[in-house]
Amino acid sequence: MVQQTFTGRKRVRKFFGHIREVAEMPNLIEVQKASYDQFLMVDEPEGGRLDEGLQAVFKSVFPINDFSGTSQLEFVRYEFEAPKYDVDECRQRGMTYAAPLKVTLRLIVFDIDEETAAKSVKDIKEQDVYMGDIPLMTMNGTFVVNGTERVIVSQMHRSPGVFFDHDKGKTHSSGKLLFAARVIPYRGSWLDIEFDAKDIVFARIDRRRKIPVTSLMFALGLDGEEILSTFYKKIIYKRAKSGSNADGWRVPYDPVRFRGYSTLNDLIDADSGKVVLEAGKKLTVRAARQLQEKGLKALRMSDEELVGMYLAEDLVNPKTGEIYAEAGEEITEKSLKALNEHGYKELPLLDIDHVNVGPYIRNTLSADKNLTREDALFDIYRVMRPGEPPTLESAQNMFQSLFFDSERYDLSAVGRVKMNMRLDLDAPDTYRTLRKEDILAVIKTLVDLRDGKGEIDDIDHLGNRRVRSVGELMENQYRVGLLRMERAIKERMSSVDIDTVMPQDLINAKPAAAAVREFFGSSQLSQFMDQTNPLSEITHKRRLSALGPGGLTRERAGFEVRDVHPTHYGRICPIETPEGPNIGLINSLATFARVNKYGFVETPYRKVKDGRVTDEVVYLSAMEEGRYHVAQANLPLDNRGRFTEDLVVCRHAGEVLPVTSDKVDFMDVSPKQLVSVAAALIPFLENDDANRALMGSNMQRQAVPLVRAEAPFVGTGMEGVVARDSGAAIAARRSGIIDQIDATRVVIRATEDLDPTKSGVDIYRLMKYQRSNQSTCINQRPLVKVGDVVKKGDIIADGPSTDLGELALGRNVLVAFMPWNGYNFEDSILLSERIVKEDVFTSIHIEEFEVMARDTKLGPEEITRDIPNVSEEALKNLDEAGIVYIGAEVRAGDILVGKITPKGESPMTPEEKLLRAIFGEKASDVRDTSLRVPPGVQGTIVEVRVFNRHGVDKDERALAIEREEIERLAKDRDDEQAILDRNVYGRLADLLENRQGIAGPKGFKKDTKITRSVIEEYPKSQWWLFASPNDKLMAEIEAMRKQYDESKKGLEQRFLDKVEKLQRGDELPPGVMKMVKVFVAVKRKIQPGDKMAGRHGNKGVVSKIVPIEDMPFLEDGTHADIVLNPLGVPSRMNVGQILETHLGWACAGLGRRIGQAVDAYLASAKQETKPLKETLKKVYGDNETIKSLNDHELVELGRNLSRGVPIATPVFDGAKEADIEQMLELAGMDKSGQSTVYDGRTGDTFDRKVTVGYIYMLKLHHLVDDKIHARSIGPYSLVTQQPLGGKAQFGGQRFGEMEVWALEAYGAAYTLQEMLTVKSDDVAGRTKVYEAIVRGDDTFEAGIPESFNVLVKEMRSLGLNVDLHNSKIGSATPTSEAAE
């Protein structure tokens, strides 16, 4: 049940879920915060920081040695200083919220002995060096960069490690599977090992030319024999003793090796000489085992059966050293004969049978042209650096640096762990480079795959993809910056006199700071935060993108990468992803998912012990989960937590299968752990088609915050969580009592967590009518009254789109599903005028306009009211500084800020000179460049900000704004001071009361009792003078006084700092003297053309707004608010909206009954609450919260419920059909959920009953006002002289090829000619038309379109001279005048 919170008592949701939630849902923006905290590690722990995050970056780059080795620059530690501006100041001033990074460096200078070359330390210097600013994360997981909020999206990429794959038979025409292995490091060169069609194994480094894999092994220091002994077993064939059962070779018998063996000759037992298998038969696995059981020890092989085998060692004459045959050589009849002649009694052969073991490595070895390590190294050098002559040393160094140098190659801890798991190795995860053993293990595993042992990897398995969050992305970026810096430092260390410099002189922090700035400013993963509503903020922070640097590109990403994978369960939402080219590449984290320290996504499960489900929660990654059987959360359990059914359907290794209940290892914690936050907000999600659910999730993020937010009647129980975690609603930081409150701030006197070092007062500033990134309105309003008691975590103020601490994206409206005169054809929506009149779907949008006054070559621009050629009427909204008043109503074309710019001197006519001489300097040398309201905007000025460059005099307006701000700061300081005084002096009086007084203020009698009345005779500041013989008491009072003085001083200091910041000039871009920002609030009522949607992907456009009296109405005279087309449901299969409608209808009915009970209570003389309590009990059953309320709270609750009883129906565990019917019955309504409806215009009943109920509708951010656009004349393109396109450019409508065909088909010749000439790019013609229209004349002539001239110019650029001859028709001689 909802815990007893301050808002939870004001509105109680009836909960339909049956499954008890065991795990707490993690904070929804934890992904961002935890990752960045781990990177920064702001507070240095005892014993220094661990090697991760920023510390690891510094450790990896430092120490830096100079080229000669005489000096070394070491990293000691780093710390952050306090940020210069706080978050709000950064937003207002367009700054970046960042903290300066201070690094302590140590420069060590060595003395080097000339003869012994021994080093001794000559000098050590330590110094703190400023290393640029590092952006800080705000409380809500965002960054403020240049005044705008940005989010760094987490990236999904391929985990480092080793992957085995095949080409699916696409490379070779035969369809043969070519296997390949790829070692992917975190940074460094990729190593590919692959088969070709002839079964030779090759290696590639960084996708370059391939080299035989044996060359790679030579370079690793193996020779031919070692290579063969690594990959193949050795079998000794012994010459049978001549004379016993004819000549031949004796072979030890191994049933595993001989299974599947096809015989050419009879198989003969070497000891008994009996035939064990006739020629031409195949030895089955069973038969092979039986032969061993019968005691078969060895087989006899004839000479010809050895032909085609391979030697395992070089065969050498021990006396002469002559090599008869080399290791890996194939035995031929000729070579066998020679060996027999030399009298070899034993032959070591390779165990290659072409069935279980293939000769791939042996074949590669024989095909390899390189025979020694040197050749192989040279070959690799030539591949990596073609065109450079190799030397042995350079080749060795290059090969060493490719895979074995920690500077150049890093597998990362993840890569090492993955590699160990895949190849069964046990290297520690601190070992981050490749080892010889790793490369050999990869080749072995690959060869085994080719031999049919083992499985290839699934690249889309979440065990093979990991998440890089903010911290890690930032770490990589900062490392890049430091490496750039390192080069510069090395050069500087060599070029300066090292004995006299300090670390400060060696370091230039610009490259590091630039790398950070570049990352936040222009990386693909640093995105402008989607701030339309709280849900869109949260979703943006929980987004996982496969795009971005080091990731995929849209074009390259195939179908498999985008698809839903079984391992997504509980980790990545299968529903929420964009439609369009990014589908499946951008995903959302599931509700309970979290990212572990290795970057793999984990999901929680309940542990099952001995068939009993416990409450112990374990987080598993995709790799770990594959080993277990996991049951669903909605399985029925008995009261002891055992499964009621014997067979349980489980997920195991990507399959779904029924198993007995004792085999189950884990169980899901919640049914909604499968989906993301946005999908978990859709009630009856289980009744919607997945495609529509996807649209529903995506459209909730586009819902515009309305003027009056209203929580949904039918919710899912997630609404409160989203409102709290997004930071839209304000939660109390500590428990306390509300002390003061107004529209802009709430002051709470803390009663718990009282820390003597902090003030006992929390002041919460509310955001009033601020502009969000998407121009929607951010406005917070308090929910508490003075004297209310709140607990830590209670919601004390609602934000945009929240209602009593719950997410409220839209409004509950009365819907009728029926056609209405074709106005809801094709998903159109018909609305009642009530919705416009009562501002149900009205939203406020705040537009920001800015103007800068720069210093130009001709003189400074000026912001002023004195503008040339502008009437007084147009200046009526401006103050004396030329800036618009707050509260002024403005419309398109009005001046917001007057500005004049100096004009270049144009040559004067004699008349002008004369006038200038007579009247002196005239204002003709400036032009009007004022900021005006753009077309399509009209509204009210809500805020003006003026920024001045340092040293520029502030105008009256800027000073007024400054004064206002200082007053506000002073009020904050005084309030905090007053509460501090009240607290401290109250405690002091309590301590002193009834004590023996041995001293006191002037006039206090010694050794008398200190009573409350005595204390209060004196001013508070003198209370500290009282003294008592109790030393312990006096020590406490002294500590209190010290603390009080410090707090007081701190308050004053903070106030002075802020004032100083206000009065200091602003940091403006170069050349800008002054900047003014004006904010205009636009009120947008809903109108035809606006897009609306429900939560089930049921979207539509408003087609008509009908007078209330014309809307269909019910028997009690209630008119429907909205009419939707019933045909929108069946084909789209989003039946959730119908269930929501029925349930909403029941909620409203129950709300009405509770409302009647409240009215009865207020009307009755006795004011008896029993009937109200009984009504509530019928609805809610035995609810703890309701039982605990007093009469006053009960009535408030009843009032809040009278519009409708809110209910929660969680996804996959919500209300069933029976529950809905029961609710309808309880509300005294028809169980069918349908009602008789009358036509508003005729009063007749409609033939059949109509589904009527309450549905939650959203108004989306696609408003017709932002899209509608018209132009008569405007800007033209430079080259073609055609009008520009698009609303932003104030462009025209394109009249394209097909439209031209239409006019041609109608034969509208004159219209067509206008379209192609005077209305487009006939420059002279269009001017003439304009003049003609102004004159009231309607004759004009079309000339030559500019595009013709462009064509002529293009042909000339190709060397074809084209001349255009203008000639009147009928004249004999054409005039040879080219049209230029």
From Swiss-Prot:
Domain of life (superkingdom): Bacteria
SUBUNIT field: The RNAP catalytic core consists of 2 alpha, 1 beta, 1 beta' and 1 omega subunit. When a sigma factor is associated with the core the holoenzyme is formed, which can initiate transcription.
Annotated PANTHER family: DNA-DIRECTED RNA POLYMERASE I SUBUNIT 2 (PTHR20856)
Family: Belongs to the RNA polymerase beta chain family.
Annotated SUPFAM superfamilies: beta and beta-prime subunits of DNA dependent RNA-polymerase (SSF64484)
An annotated GO BP: DNA-templated transcription
Keywords (A to Z) from UniProt: DNA-directed RNA polymerase, Nucleotidyltransferase, Transcription, Transferase
PROSITE patterns in alphabetical order: RNA_POL_BETA
Organism of this sequence: Nitrobacter hamburgensis (strain DSM 10229 / NCIMB 13809 / X14)
GO cellular component terms, semicolon-separated: DNA-directed RNA polymerase complex
Gene Ontology MF terms in the entry: DNA binding; DNA-directed RNA polymerase activity; ribonucleoside binding
Protein name: DNA-directed RNA polymerase subunit beta
Reactions mediated catalytically: RNA(n) + a ribonucleoside 5'-triphosphate = RNA(n+1) + diphosphate
Top-level enzyme category: transferase
Record-linked CDD domains: RNA_pol_B_RPB2 (cd00653)
